[in-house]
Amino acid sequence: MKLAIPNKGRLQQPVLQFLNYVGIRPLSSDERALIIPTNWEGIQLVMLRTEDIPSLVEAGAADIGITGYDYVLESGANVDELIRLDFGKAKIVLAVPLSWDYNSPDQIKQEIRIATKYYNLAKKYITEKGIPAKVVKISGAAEVIPSLGAADAIIDVMSTGTTLKLHGLKPLDTVLETQAVVIGNRYWMKSDEADKINLMLTMMKGALYARNKKMIFMNVPDSKLNNVIQSLPAMLSPTLSKLAKGDAWEVITVIDGDKLPEIIAKVVANGARDIVVVDIEKVIK
């Protein structure tokens, strides 16, 4: 089974880190290698340009791919979006010179030139917004193009806005919000690799779900048990085990990590003790 991932760019390291968290690790660090075996038998990583992944997955060069949602839409590839990964988030924005006294794209009345690598997204955007513009397709860094006089504005990725400001630009409107996504060609469920792909997708979903989860173990006196249980949000319900000695119970539950301080304070106030908090690697549902 071939899994296409970015060979460089802003998504490469986050994708590799996520795969490592899932349990998929490349067995070679050779940056020149285009197809790399992994520790999962039968799964190979195919290193491709991020923007090429949707079209090549559609063509069957890989069964599954991880790329940006922006590139899926830009390519128009006939692929299935399988999982949104909740990382690699960014905005595709229309950016104009800081000197322009515009607060909205509706204020653009005269034709402008927009430089972008997102030609199809840009054409769709200006049509929907009614912006008089000519789209100039480029493949490199867009931020410098207005200062060179080759365009008036750009449509490009913005993470923080620092790079835009450095080049005398400001975001005027959001064209699209993007993130990393897992995609598959339309035939993956009927392929010989379907079972392997389904297992990998299950593990990915389990890793995503567990990313901000904590498991809590605590001992609770019998007389305090109901009060402690009432203070616990659980995925289903807390797991209870009677301790071998004494009138006490072991209580086990799973909570969101950002609620940990609040929950700890409540259970301690209600009589819990000997509390142990453990990170969760995966939750398979």
Swiss-Prot record:
Its main location: cytoplasm. Its cofactor is Mg(2+). Gene3D superfamilies: 3.30.70.120, Periplasmic binding protein-like II. Keywords: Amino-acid biosynthesis, ATP-binding, Cytoplasm, Glycosyltransferase, Histidine biosynthesis, Magnesium, Metal-binding, Nucleotide-binding, Transferase. Feedback inhibited by histidine. GO terms for biological process: L-histidine biosynthetic process. It catalyses: 1-(5-phospho-beta-D-ribosyl)-ATP + diphosphate = 5-phospho-alpha-D-ribose 1-diphosphate + ATP. It is found in: Cytoplasm. It is an enzyme of class 2 (transferase). Its EC number is 2.4.2.17. It holds the Pfam family HisG_C. The keyword Magnesium applies. The keyword Transport does not apply. Belongs to the ATP phosphoribosyltransferase family. Long subfamily. NCBIfam families: hisG, HisG_C-term. Catalyzes the condensation of ATP and 5-phosphoribose 1-diphosphate to form N'-(5'-phosphoribosyl)-ATP (PR-ATP). Has a crucial role in the pathway because the rate of histidine biosynthesis seems to be controlled primarily by regulation of HisG enzymatic activity. HAMAP family: HisG_Long (MF_00079). This is ATP phosphoribosyltransferase.
